[in-house]
């Protein structure tokens, strides 16, 4: 047996039964990239003998530190990263035309792509995002650079080359349907040839308005051929919904368009879902499609208030997304907070409404996201056998937004981090057992 690294102290994670489970005085053993035990620290002497653990492989957490699963961002636009925190003055469709498409068009320049993607992935890792579901741009070479960057940094990710040939600017659209399909398949094979357990391709029609019916059908066939994930947008704003109905008059809904062309699968991630009708929710549930809830973006672009309680009650898989740059923060901690506040806002307008709790939002940010991307057998919490994607958090680090007092309980320290903490409180980031960011060195 190889060397086992052991973390002792407080851990917090989510399970299907408990949205937030806090376990104190625990020992977590990691062999290579997987969790081999989660036991009371009182059993450590026995565990050391059983696993031949050397004292130098033990990391003892202080009373202000805890271990939590890595955060999962189920929806982010990597080429929009330069716009994060600016240009949020227009609603969705006008915002795309005026700010987003011009920025994404710049990624035809490989040097620009390399610089921006390096900054984006580094930022997300510092913010604790161990897994990200990335929209790239429509540029094949530029999106290969995104895949290479993620691979080199050690982040877990789904990476997609955007497909769009209709209803988009002439300076930023693919030449033809055949070119789009050819380059998408080339990109899929390129990512697969990285032979990485962490970086996977994801088929990415930008949205129904930008992809004619045959285009979406053939992208769905490509995904099936290569056993790929799929991602797109759905029911983000009312004006978008109306537009989809005009473009696809034969359909009964936005979700029906995707269902008809074969894009709704159990490996599909649909971003937003703000304006889903009941029959659309049922269709997503039947197909196993997950929803990326992006509350910051939905508020910033005035798209609407997504009723996450409704989606969860219907049995949908739901995770959180930053949707940079529609969302102004690249941190899933921000999405977690905004999700709670959005749900509380809905509760002020709906008698008897049960808003989601901070603990439930924590589960969305970790295990929920893992389920949306069909990786809950590998990541999302600290179950034995799963890969070790984790954050070492310290709520007492100097110069952070947190104030900790002697009477604070462990639960209160964790709540303070979730509501007020930031990347300065995250000391170490692990992906598949590898330390990819370390502030303790």
Predicted region positions:
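Alpha-helical scaffold segments that flank or form the walls of functional sites
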Residues: 66, 84-155, 180-196
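Metal-coordinating catalytic core of metallo-dependent amide/deamination hydrolases
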Residues: 141-273
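Glycine-enriched alpha-helix->loop->beta-strand junction motifs that scaffold or abut catalytic
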Residues: 154-156, 220-229, 263-266, 283-292, ...
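N-terminal metal-binding scaffold of metallo-dependent hydrolase/deaminase domains
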Residues: 1-54, 59, 65
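C-terminal cap of metal-dependent C-N hydrolases
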Residues: 16, 387-441
């Amino acid at each position: 047996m190889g060397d086992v690294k052991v973390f002792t102290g407080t851990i917090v994670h989510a399970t299907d039964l408990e949205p937030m489970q806090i376990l104190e005085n625990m020992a977590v053993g990691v062999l290579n990239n997987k969790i081999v035990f989660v036991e009371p620290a009182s059993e450590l002497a026995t565990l050391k003998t059983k696993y031949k653990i050397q004292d130098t492989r033990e990391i003892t957490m202080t009373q202000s530190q805890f271990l939590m699963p890595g955060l999962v961002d189920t929806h982010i636009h990597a080429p929009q990263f330069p716009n994060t925190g600016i240009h949020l003055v227009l609603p969705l469709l006008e915002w795309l035309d005026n700010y987003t498409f011009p920025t994404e068009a710049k990624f035809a320049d490989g040097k620009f792509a390399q610089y921006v993607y390096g900054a984006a992935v580094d930022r997300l890792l510092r913010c604790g995002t161990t897994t990200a579901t990335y929209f790239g741009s429509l540029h094949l070479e530029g999106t290969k650079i995104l895949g290479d960057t993620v691979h080199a940094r050690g982040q877990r990710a789904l990476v997609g080359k955007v497909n769009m040939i209709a209803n988009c600017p002439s300076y930023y659209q693919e030449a033809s349907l055949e070119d789009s399909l050819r380059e998408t398949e080339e990109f899929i094979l390129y990512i697969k040839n990285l032979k990485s357990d962490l970086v996977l391709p994801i088929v990415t029609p930008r949205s129904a308005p930008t992809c004619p019916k045959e285009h979406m059908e053939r992208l769905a066939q490509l995904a099936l051929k290569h056993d790929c994930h799929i991602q797109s947008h759905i029911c983000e704003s009312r004006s978008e919904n109306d537009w989809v109905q005009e473009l696809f008059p034969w359909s009964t809904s936005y979700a029906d368009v995707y269902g008809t062309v074969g894009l709704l699968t159990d490996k599909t991630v649909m971003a937003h879902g703000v304006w889903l009708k009941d029959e659309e929710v049922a269709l997503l549930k039947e197909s196993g499609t997950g929803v990326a809830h992006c509350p910051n973006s939905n508020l910033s672009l005035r798209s609407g208030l997504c009723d996450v309680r409704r989606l969860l009650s219907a049995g949908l898989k739901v995770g959180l997304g930053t949707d940079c740059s529609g969302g102004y923060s690249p941190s899933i901690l921000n999405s977690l907070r905004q999700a709670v506040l959005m749900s509380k806002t809905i509760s002020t307008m709906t008698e008897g409404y049960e808003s989601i709790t901070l603990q439930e939002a924590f589960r969305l940010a970790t295990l929920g996201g893992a389920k949306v991307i069909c990786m809950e057998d590998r990541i999302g919490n600290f179950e034995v056998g799963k890969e070790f994607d984790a954050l070492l958090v310290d709520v007492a680090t100097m110069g952070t937004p947190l104030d900790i007092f002697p009477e604070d309980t462990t639960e209160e320290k964790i709540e303070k981090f979730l509501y007020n903490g930031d990347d300065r409180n995250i000391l170490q980031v692990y992906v598949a057992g590898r330390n990819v960011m370390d502030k303790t060195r």
